[in-house]
Amino acid sequence: WGATQAIPTFDLGWRILFPIYMIVAVIAILLLNVTQIKEEKEEGKPSTFGQCLALLGKPFILLSFIGIMCHVGIDVGTNTTAPKILMERLGMGLDDAAFATSLYFIFRTAGCFLGSFILRKMSPKSFFGISVLMMLIAMAGLFIFHDKTMIYVCIGLIGFGNSNVFSVVFSQALLYLPGKKNEVSGLMIMGLFGGTVFPLAMGVA
């Protein structure tokens, strides 16, 4: 929304964002291609898929996996339902209600940026707890409020609170089993499928 107001659209409207994303992606690929990365040599045999899944038997890893699922589920779910909430409760049109998605990403981006500084001063555990508390308060607010400003505040709090959950959970899971970094990384990334599970459940509900 903001980008299409500030740059020429060439009669493409919001679709102008796709060429911009493509250019950014190509630049990132080229820069990554010329970046020297020293990878550690793997010792021993690679773990099998079954051995990776067996790590879910450890409570901390299982909770981290569920945390990643919830993080992505909240992310996708908020994007899809926030405009719908505004349309149902305030009678807004789709074009106006779509600003809720932009608002979510504005606060999510701000949270990612500020999180890098906050985590220098605060422990990951405390920051994670505050982030979750912000989201819980905001979600409760979405059930209660019918005022546009308060709904916007709740959406912003969810975006800010959810901005650093993935990085905190992912890093803590790796620190828990430093000898199984590849396996743990694979499991955490597998948790991204929560983005398909939670919106489906929300749609059924």
What are these regions (language model features)?
Residues 176-205:
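A late C-terminal transmembrane helix in Major Facilitator Superfamily
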Residues 126-141:
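Structural signature of the two symmetry-related core transmembrane helices
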Residues 54-112:
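Extracytoplasmic gate region of multi-pass secondary transporters
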Residues 37-64:
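Juxtamembrane intracellular "pre-TM" segments in multi-pass secondary transporters
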Residues 1-36:
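Helix-loop-helix hairpin linking two adjacent transmembrane segments in secondary transporters
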Residues 163-178:
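Intracellular juxtamembrane helix-capping segments at the cytosolic ends
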Residues 111-124:
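Helix-to-loop junctions at the C-terminal end of transmembrane segments
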Residues 149-157:
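Paired small-residue
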